[in-house]
Structures are given as structure tokens and as C-alpha cells.
Amino acid sequence: MNTFQDQSGSSSNREPLLRCSDARRDLELAIGGVLRAEQQIKDNLREVKAQIHSCISRHLECLRSREVWLYEQVDLIYQLKEETLQQQAQQLYSLLGQFNCLTHQLECTQNKDLANQVSVCLERLGSLTLKPEDSTVLLFEADTITLRQTITTFGSLKTIQIPEHLMAHASSANIGPFLEKRGCISMPEQKSASGIVAVPFSEWLLGSKPASGYQAPYIPSTDPQDWLTQKQTLENSQTSSRACNFFNNVGGNLKGLENWLLKSEKSSYQKCNSHSTTSSFSIEMEKVGDQELPDQDEMDLSDWLVTPQESHKLRKPENGSRETSEKFKLLFQSYNVNDWLVKTDSCTNCQGNQPKGVEIENLGNLKCLNDHLEAKKPLSTPSMVTEDWLVQNHQDPCKVEEVCRANEPCTSFAECVCDENCEKEALYKWLLKKEGKDKNGMPVEPKPEPEKHKDSLNMWLCPRKEVIEQTKAPKAMTPSRIADSFQVIKNSPLSEWLIRPPYKEGSPKEVPGTEDRAGKQKFKSPMNTSWCSFNTADWVLPGKKMGNLSQLSSGEDKWLLRKKAQEVLLNSPLQEEHNFPPDHYGLPAVCDLFACMQLKVDKEKWLYRTPLQM
């Protein structure tokens, strides 16, 4: 019995305990909601004050700007009136001076001409206005009553009532969207049949927000009822129809945009049809929501999808040949050898971009003195960049350092400090030089200009043999001497042009003797004697260098060098391996050509060294 009574007593005490715990939990939740609301009100207070300050400050700036504008207008009106009155005063002063002169002359002498002048001055006086031509009244009118009323009634503060069902789940996520509304706009409560606040469709669209004021980020609701599908009322059906119209308009705009893109792509495709290959591509349109695009059956996708695979295959050979020709064009483009040469190190090309320490005695070795001033140079504007691009390949006809007559040469002609600008004199001399005249205007025989590519190649190649020979070359041969040499060659027997039979093996020590005898026989024959003084460069077809053909040295007899190469080839192991016939090589020039290609002996003996003359 006692146990039953204890159980009944405990069950009777449990119900009040549960009620107390529920009430305490509700109170704690309510207190938490109130505290959060208080904190949100404080935050909202700061936001509203910031909005008020920003709005008032901006309108005060507008008033200040209006004040400055009115000051400028007053100054402008004052200047106009002052100029008008000054012109009138000048005319009156001029006429007053004339009357003073006439009065003085009339007091001294009596002359009829003076009477005529007096009448003219009186007529001018009658035509002038003696009163000020412009008024001196300048007033400022302001509708202070309207301005004061507008200022006193400017702005308003409104608040909204939070729905009860949201107060039950009071949280920052639920209260936030209602507290972050604009300060000057109040949203009336719109309850649907289910009791949920219906938000208009316009609130879901991206609209213009005020520039000032902090907008809290959107936080999704934690209430499950907000995520369930609600029954559509009349207003909800209207908003859904507006959504359909909106998406239809978006789809129509996209469709028109695709048609516009189709035209431009087709036109550009037709332009580049014969020039370059076009890769197949297609334009895909995203579906906007679940709404179908209008007029989808009327429009075929093939009308705006561009897929030119077949035409691309047909044009492939032609375009391939064109691409090949474009690639070969690169081989014939002009180039500058200086682009391949090593550039001089900049004095700022070190770690930390700090200039190197240079002694005063070695300042002349610096190539980039202006690099130290790069930090002080102003930033280049687009116009300056365009000018630099236009003049990057421009070469001045004369240098300032070579022309300037000042003690310290100027950096440019514009900064020349001479009495007469050096640029004019230098330009005059340059024009005379271009016309083929000297400084006195007399015509001068033009000197042949050396080839440009040779100068560029000599910058980084070893000095060539021709350049050395040209410095030591004698005067040009006369035409009669060339004709005599040609006559000697024409009358020479054909046996002189054939290759001699090779020498037998077993007597290697006699080879130098036979070569000496062969050399002596060469000098004894009239043809060989004529070749010694005969310059073969006169028989070579010249390029652009017409004046330096006869400057080659006659001591370097190339015909003898070719015959010497024959003998070296016939006595070399190459002849023993292949057993070439005596007339295998033909003329000496052909022999020399193939010897350069097939000779396996040490080329240092005859290719890079000049053979000794016998």
C-alpha cells in the first residue's frame, strides 16, 4: 500500500514539475528573443543614424554647391555690368577731352574750323547717353518658406509590427528580414488564407538599392512552414503569371539575341571563308527555369547553329597551301642582326635594382646613364606610347653630338643654346648631301655605298678574306687588259684545261719534286704567266657592289689555287679509294666544288690557309 501511495504521489508531483519546466523554458526563450530584439534594435539604430547623417550631409553638399554656383553667377553679372559701364565711361572721357581742347583753342584764337569741330562734337554728345546704360540693381530672391518647410518635413521614421507566429520562433533569421527594410518605406502586412505573409513578386527581383546604409545579408528561414508549398490565392496567381511573363520575355530576348549573333557569325564566316579554316562550333541556349520558350516550334535549331564541317573539308587543300605560303613568308622577312647580339649590361641590372658603383674615371664606359633617372620619369600616356611606336624606326639625318657647336653638346636640337640653331645648318648640309652636292652646292660624284648586310655581318663574324684583299687591292684593271686576258684564254690549247694523270705510288719522296717541276712549267707557259696578273673577280657577275670589283689582289691567283687543289686531290687517299678517272671532275671550277664536298683529308692544309705560290 505504501508503495502505491508513493507512486501516486510522485505522479501527481510530476505534472506540476513538467509544467514548471515548460514555463521556464518558454520564459528563457522569450527572454532570449527579447534580448536579441534589443540587440537588433541597437544595430538598427546605428544603421538609421548613419542613413540620416549620410542623407542630410549629401543634401548639405548640394546646398553648398548651389551656394557656390550662385556666387559664380553674381560675379559673372558683375563683370558684364562693369564692362558696359567702363565702355560708356571711356566714350564720355574721350568726348570730354575733345571739349576741353576746343575750349582752350577758342579762348586763344578764333577760327571757323574750330566752330565746325564744335558742331561735330555736339552732335556726338547728342547721340551719347548721359545716364548709366546698365542698372545697378542686383537682388537675391529665395523662397525661404518652401525651403524651411521642406527641411522641417524632410525624412520620416516608420516601424513595422512583427507577426505573432514569427515571434514564437523569435530569432535573428526571422526578425532580420523585417528589420532590414528601407527606413522611409513601410511594408503593410499581407496575410494569405494560411496565415503566412505573402511577399510581392517585385521584392524577389533585383532592384535599385539606396547607395547609403548597410544591408544585412539574406539568411534563410528556419521555420519549416516557410519551406512548404502554400495554397495559391488570387494574389499568388497574379504573381505567378507575372513570373511567367517575365521568363517569357527573357526567353524572347535571348532568342532575339541568338538571331543577332547568328547574323554576325555568318557574315564573319563568309568573310574568312577563303582565308582561314573555321572550326565547327555551336551555340547552346540555357533553359530559363522550367518555362518553355515561345515560338519554339516555329524556329528550327539549324537556323542558328553554325556547323560548317563539310565546307571545312572541301576547303582544306586550298587553306593548307595558303598556310604553307604564309609560313614560307616568314623566311623572306628582313631581320636585324643586332637583335641576335648580346646587349650591353645595364648598370641597374643587378640584385635589388641598385646601380653599380662606378669610378669617376670610368664614367665614359657607361652605356645607360639614363637608367638612373627611370624612376623620375613620368608615366607614359597612350599618346606618348603611340609617338614612341611611330618613331621607333626613325633615324635622324644627323646626330646632335656631331653637329652642335656649343662647349657642352646639347641633348636635342630643341635645347640648342647657340645663336643660330644647329638643326637648320645640319639639315641644310644633309639635304645637299642627299642631292649629291657639297657644302657649296657643287655636284659631287656619288660614291658607291657598301652593302648593308656585310656591315652587319662583320659585327659578329670573323673578318673575311675579301675585306682584307680589298684593303690591299691595287687600282682597277683597264678594259684593254681584260680583253687581252680573254684573248690569251681563247687562244690557249684545250689540253691546258684537262686534269693531269695521277702519279704512281712507291715514290712519295718524289712528289714534291714533281710538284715543283709542274709549278715551274706552269709559270713558263704563256697562259700561266697571263693568269698570274689576271684578276678573276672581273669575270664574276657583280651584285650591288659595282665599284669594288677590281680591287681584289692579283697576288692571290685563284686559278692557280684551283689547279693546286686538283693536284692535292689527285695525290690524296681519296683518289686511291675511289680510283676516279682523270677526266672525272671536268673543269677546274667543278673539281674545286666537288673537292669541298667529298675530301676526307685534313682540310686545314688547303681550306683555311693560303697555299704558297710556286
Curated annotation (Swiss-Prot):
Major subcellular location class: cytoplasm
UniProt keywords, alphabetically: Activator, Chromosomal rearrangement, Chromosome, Cytoplasmic vesicle, Lysosome, Nucleus, Proto-oncogene, Transcription, Transcription regulation, Ubl conjugation
Induction: Down-regulated by nutrient deprivation (at protein level).
Source superkingdom: Eukaryota
A GO cellular-component term linked to this record: nucleus
Free-text description of this protein's post-translational modifications in UniProt: NCOA4 levels may be regulated via HERC2-mediated ubiquitination leading to proteosomal degradation; HERC2 association is dependent on NCOA4 iron occupancy.
Organs and tissues of expression: Widely expressed. Also detected in adipose tissues and in different cell lines. Isoform Beta is only expressed in testis.
Marked site (Breakpoint for rearrangement to form RET/PTC3 oncogene) residue numbers: 238-239
Biased composition (Basic and acidic residues): 502-519
Keyword Transcription appears in the UniProt entry: yes
An annotated GO BP: estrogen receptor signaling pathway
Region (Interaction with ferritin heavy chain FTH1): 383-522
Molecular-function GO terms, alphabetical: transcription coactivator activity
Region ranges (Disordered): 501-524
Subunit details: Interacts with the ferritin complex, an oligomeric structure composed of varying combinations of ferritin heavy chains and ferritin light chains. Interacts (via C-terminus) with ferritin heavy chain FTH1 (via 'Arg-23'); thereby targeting the iron-binding ferritin complex to autolysosomes following starvation or iron depletion. Interacts with ferritin light chain FTL. Interacts (via C-terminus) with ATG8-like proteins GABARAP and GABARAPL1; thereby mediating localization to autophagosomes and ferritinophagy. Interacts with MAP1LC3C/LC3C and GABARAPL2.
Associated disease: A chromosomal aberration involving NCOA4 is found in papillary thyroid carcinomas (PTCs). Inversion inv(10)(q11.2;q11.2) generates the RET/NCOA4 (PTC3) oncogene.
The protein's name in its UniProt record: Nuclear receptor coactivator 4
Organism of provenance: Homo sapiens (Human)
Lineage, uppermost ranks: Eukaryota, Metazoa, Chordata, Craniata, Vertebrata
